[in-house]
Amino acid sequence: MTIHKVEGKVYVEFPVAMLGREMLFASSIENTSDGGEGAPGQLGGTDVRFRFEMIDSTLVARMPLLSKPVNTSGDAYIARALDNAHNPGIFKSFKVLACTPDSSALVVDMKGLFLEGSAFTKPFPSTSANGYYGFVSRDHSLQSDKSAILGVSASENHISVCEELSYTVDHTLMGAYNMYKDVPLTAVVTKMLCILPEEPMTPRLADSRLGLTTQLKSDYSGATQEVKSIRYAKRWRIEPSDSAAYRRGELVRPVKQLVFYIDSLMPVKWNPYIKAGAESWNKAFEKIGFKDVICVKEFPKNDTLFNANSFDCMTIRYSASWLNSAQTTIHSDTRTGEILNASILINANMISVQYADRIGATVAIDPRVRTTVFPQEIQGELIQAAIAQAVGTGLGL
């Protein structure tokens, strides 16, 4: 897709060949007036899918249900019944303004999709600091007159719109007590429309005995069977680059490595432990025939094309937040459970909890921790363990 910004409009040359394809909407926060609503670098929002279709001379964005039931019976009548009962609703419509000279693309103004304030496209994660672990709900109201499009860009598989968004936010404690009302919030956000795989990955049923991140589905498995609840495991599409060598039992690299980039704002002394913690998972992948699946790099210094806020880029970011843990955000293809992006946020206050946990667990037997400041060796071990856990979550565990 090609995208243009002209006088505040967002003109997209939408390929006719892309009609009917599934796309994912995602958001990334670049900077904000309140990091408690979402940390810079954090991918927020929900895994909303859109499918674009033509109705007369109008391009419409349909939004399939995230939890559309599946039909494992193979019964054509059940399939038709499910389709009739779950036809995706129209989320936005766009008047076709022109066609490209070769008629291969439709020109539409998509400003209404990117500059809108519904819960489906807002960039703020539910797990941010102002949510106080779920006790406080926040209602964000977009102020369109105080918001603007800053720039647009496109890559091979997605288009991006950078915008400055202003909101008023209401904070409600436990659904009953109004803590704050109309709190002003302004954030620079990149919103992205990403093309999902044309050939969906084969789903894998999750086993409840294993600790996996899952996607809940209802299964209509036949007229004589009850409707069952099943779960798809969220997992990466790890495929061997050399199938013949893989079948011979040799270790092979995957077609696509999982590359994490370390934030340039991260304390430099942490970087070796972050790299060691993330790449420690490669030992597990070797048990199933893969090597060098996970790779950790620092932000490139002289690469003008590198964009840490792109959906194609997985990052390990540093956040000046009181939250006391590492947070992992996963974006997946809700049709199959395929993980498409996993990014990690290291909150500054994580160190305090690591200190308290290590003191409580080992102070009786380890004299090295009987101090107010841990030695670098111990602090590094704790950071390495926290990163290994966060990356494990990003792998779907």
Describe the role of every protein-language-model region.
Residues 271, 377-378:
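A generic secondary-structure micro-motif detector
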Residues 294:
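Conserved structured catalytic cores and adjacent interaction surfaces
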Residues 266, 270-272:
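Ordered core of a single globular domain
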Residues 276-283, 337, 381-397:
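Active-site recognition of the HExxH zinc-binding catalytic motif
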Residues 1-266, 284, 288, 299-354, ...:
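Auxiliary tRNA-acceptor-end handling modules of aminoacyl-tRNA synthetases
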